[in-house]
Amino acid sequence: MACPKKKTSKSKRSMRRAAWKRQAALQAQRALSIGKSILTERAQGFYFPEAEEENEDEQE
């Protein structure tokens, strides 16, 4: 026969929520840092293609 599970305490719930929010804030900070480096053209850790539309106009 199925028995009901015990209720999760408020402290455990708040600890899990705080850990989740901490991880989300760290990811947001990293994304903002990458965006800033792309805008200032100082990004060296990854490759992103140049705009192809400009090259097509020059060839015609």
From Swiss-Prot:
UniProt region (Disordered), positions on chain: 1-22
Single Gene Ontology BP annotation: translation
InterPro entries: Ribosomal_bL32 (IPR002677), Ribosomal_bL32_plant/cyanobact (IPR044958), Ribosomal_zn-bd (IPR011332)
GO cellular component: large ribosomal subunit
Coiled coil (residue ranges): none
Parts of the chain that traverse the membrane: none
A Gene Ontology molecular function term of the record: structural constituent of ribosome
Annotated Basic residues bias: 1-20
Keywords: Ribonucleoprotein, Ribosomal protein
Family (UniProt): Belongs to the bacterial ribosomal protein bL32 family.
Name this protein carries in UniProt: Large ribosomal subunit protein bL32
Gene this chain is encoded by: rpmF
